[in-house]
From Swiss-Prot:
Predominant subcellular localization, coarse grouping: cytoplasm
Domain KH, first and last residues per copy: 553-612
Cellular component annotations (GO), alphabetically ordered: cytosol
Stated family: Belongs to the polyribonucleotide nucleotidyltransferase family.
Protein name stated in the entry: Polyribonucleotide nucleotidyltransferase
Catalytic activity: RNA(n+1) + phosphate = RNA(n) + a ribonucleoside 5'-diphosphate
CDD domains in UniProt: KH-I_PNPase, RNase_PH_PNPase_1, RNase_PH_PNPase_2, S1_PNPase
Cofactor(s) listed: Mg(2+)
């Protein structure tokens, strides 16, 4: 008999349930976590032994959404789920980031976490549920893991923080922040905001961390009852003698190498030193393990850099702690793109373009939470040449998707409303050089490219990456970190925003003991850096250009009577297709009668507007039109008037004498003047050639084909 072990408690406005012992009993651990009908099944499997020669921690997190969770069948050809969507990839990263630092440094056994969404309440996003599930499953598994963690989403509505807001509440919120951490420390923050202050953002982080303590308490309670025995795993003993010998051979030389400011030259020197040390030690003792020597070298290298920073010495490239690298900002660098910019910060460089399209170019997203249309696209590309390497070039990797989403969050709050700027906008950031903070360079480049394209963004946006080095009570916050400082530091966080406030914040903390005060110092230092970068950017371009590129489609908007939409579209889309071909424009019609005509040529747009106005014009009884014969039948002829509308000329109305055969008087395609006699309740039009050609008749209205 299967007996589940359950913890059920109130979490904000929702009831959270964590259940184990019922399913997937061959996995190392498994839990079902539900929050008001949104349920995620999370499993963990860990290998008891590490693979020989394993040099990194092989943790894999897979988050997958099943359409049956929302009572739907996949719309793909094979009617089953395929490769992960962008949303699934981002959630996988969201789960991975706070749990990865909680495994011991020397633990190299393979661990896989799989989170499957099996039931969905559209008001409750499954990402928080999945994060809690991963924490619970790892804590139950017995695998070496310094958790559990809690997770919370924080909104900001009417100047109040809201815990785990619903989907509807998030639409009204000026903040969407996810925070995860242990009982004593914040580990991860991911957020987008509608221009909030540093204090408001920090308050949200602290609020979310305080509220999630109930989750941690209940996971600990569940582990006490149902947790598996802790693995008998011991960290490998440190070879103190070897460590001292490596430090003696390498420490001073590595210190000298880290005075080289140019990245590639420094890397070459560091690699040469490491190779020399390995060769020297192996020459003395062939039985030594090369990978062990390399691990110790990495530790010595890390200590060299961190010690310099903590002593207040200049950083790797000679800067002080709060200095920004040299900036070079250019706009309009590509002649045919709608907007472009080249943003360079030290050895990090982004070529960013902005392209304008119509509503037809928007991305339709069929997500589990519901369908939506995205008219602002942001794509980030990180080719191998940007770091002087060779490698595969193809579809975007998880990192590129994550960095693109972060950069998009930084700019999103500044984008104009669709009714003010009815274009689909695509921004692409090509990272051409990288030495730290390429995602924030993408934010700066995007702001410049959008202004260059004439997109009326509300304000310029800049981004900056910050780092932290901390030993006991001594800490140093670094502005505009290099790649090495990111790798060797204890925290990296990225802040994007305008002069008025923050639009995006991403924080990853690798150690405990980061207090509110430290985060406050870091955020304030980031503000100074952001304002400095904005000042340089504004020298290149301070406001959006007054007009869009001559190569961009111009969208003209008119309104028609919604009852006339069917006339413009025609049977099976025949009229609108003909209009598009005839005028060389793109025409989009909304249900409320809004018509958008897009064309790169202004005259073509005017022609399309005139044709639509002709089609939608009301037919006036008694008025004479120039028409074209479209069909001939025994009892008369059908004549097209007023841009696609047809009326019947009865055989008795063709001439002022008896007509035996219609074709004796009329031919297909013949142009004839006709007078409107009547429009009945069903919209049928009765016409007369006889009365239109009578001596007292006036001149016909212009022809509308």
């Amino acid at each position: 008999m299967l007996t589940p072990i359950i913890r059920k408690f109130q979490y904000g406005q929702h009831t959270l349930t964590i259940e184990t012992g019922m399913m997937a009993r061959q996995a190392t651990a498994a839990v079902m976590v539900s929050m008001d009908d949104t349920a995620v099944f999370v499993t963990v499997v860990g290998q008891k032994k590490a693979k020989p020669g394993q040099s990194f921690f092989p943790l894999t997190v897979n988050y997958q959404e099943r359409t049956y969770a929302a009572g739907r069948i996949p719309g793909s050809f094979f009617r089953r789920e395929g490769r992960p969507s962008e949303g699934e990839t981002l959630t996988s990263r969201l789960i991975d980031r706070p749990i990865r630092p909680l495994f011991p440094d020397s633990f190299l056994n393979e661990v896989q976490v799989i989170a499957t969404v099996v039931s969905l309440n559209p008001q409750v996003n499954p990402d928080i549920v999945a994060m809690i599930g991963a924490s619970a499953a790892l804590s139950l598994s017995g695998i070496p893991f310094n958790g559990p963690i809690g997770s919370a989403r924080v909104g900001y509505i009417n100047n109040q923080y809201v815990l785990n807001p619903t989907s509807d509440e998030l639409k009204e919120s000026s903040l969407d922040l996810v925070v995860a951490g242990t009982a004593g420390a914040v580990l991860m923050v991911e957020s987008e905001a509608d221009v909030l202050s540093e204090d408001q953002m920090l308050g949200a982080v602290v609020f979310g961390h305080e509220q999630q303590q109930i989750v941690i308490e209940n996971i600990n309670s569940l582990v006490a009852e149902a947790g598996k025995a802790k693995w008998d795993w011991q960290a490998p003993a440190v070879n103190e003698a070897l460590h001292a010998r490596v430090a003696e051979l390498a420490e001073g030389r590595l210190g000298d190498a880290y005075h080289i400011t140019e990245k590639q030259e420094r890397y070459a020197q560091v690699d040469a030193i490491k190779s020399s040390v390995v060769e020297t030690l192996l020459a003395q003792d062939e039985t030594l393990d090369v990978s062990e020597i390399q691990d110790i070298l990495g530790s010595v290298e890390k200590n060299v850099v961190r010690s310099r920073v903590l002593r207040g010495e200049p950083r790797i490239d000679g800067r002080e702690k709060d200095m920004i690298r040299g900036l070079d900002v250019r706009t309009g660098v590509l002649p045919r793109t709608h907007g472009s910019a080249l943003f360079t910060r030290g050895e990090t460089q982004a070529l960013v373009t902005a392209t304008l399209g119509t509503a037809r170019d928007a991305q339709n997203l069929d997500e589990l939470m519901g369908e939506k249309t995205d008219s602002f696209l942001f794509h980030y590309n990180f080719p191998p040449y940007s770091v002087g390497e060779t490698g595969m070039v193809g579809s975007p990797k998880r990192r590129e998707i994550g960095h693109g989403r972060l950069a998009k969050r930084g700019v999103l709050a500044m984008m104009p409303k669709p009714e003010d700027f009815p274009y689909t906008v695509r921004v692409v950031s090509e990272i051409t050089e990288s030495n730290g903070s390429s995602s924030m360079a993408s934010v700066c480049g995007a702001s410049l490219a959008l202004m260059d394209a004439g997109v009326p963004i509300k304000a310029a946006v800049a981004g900056i990456a910050m780092g932290l080095v901390k030993e006991q009570d001594n800490f140093v916050v670094l502005s505009d970190i290099l790649g090495d400082e990111d790798h060797l530091g204890d925290m990296d966080f990225k802040v994007a925003g305008s002069r008025d406030g923050i639009t995006a914040l991403q924080m990853d903390i690798k150690i405990e003991g980061i207090t509110r005060e430290i985060m406050q110092v870091a955020l304030n230092q980031a503000k100074g850096a952001r304002l400095h970068i904005l000042g340089v950017m504004e020298q290149a371009i301070s406001t959006p250009r007054g007009d869009i590129s001559q190569f961009a489609p111009r969208i003209h908007t008119i309104r028609i009577n919604p009852d006339k939409i069917k006339d413009v579209i025609g049977k099976g889309g025949s009229v609108i297709r003909a209009l598009t071909e005839e005028t060389g424009t793109t025409i989009e019609i909304e249900d409320d009668g809004t018509v958008k005509i897009a064309a790169t040529d202004g005259e073509k747009a005017k022609f399309a507007i005139r044709r639509i106005e002709e089609i939608t014009a009301e037919i006036e009884v008694g008025r004479i039109y120039q028409g074209k014969v479209t069909r001939i039948v025994d009892f008369g002829a059908f004549v097209a008037i007023g841009g696609g509308k047809e009326g019947l000329v009865h055989i008795s109305q063709i001439a002022d004498k008896r007509v035996e055969k219609v074709t004796d008087y009329l031919q297909m395609g013949q142009e004839v003047p006709v007078k409107v006699l009547e429009v009945d309740r069903q919209g049928r039009v009765r016409l007369s050639i006889k009365e239109a050609t009578a001596p007292e008749a006036g001149s016909p209205a212009p022809e509308a084909e």
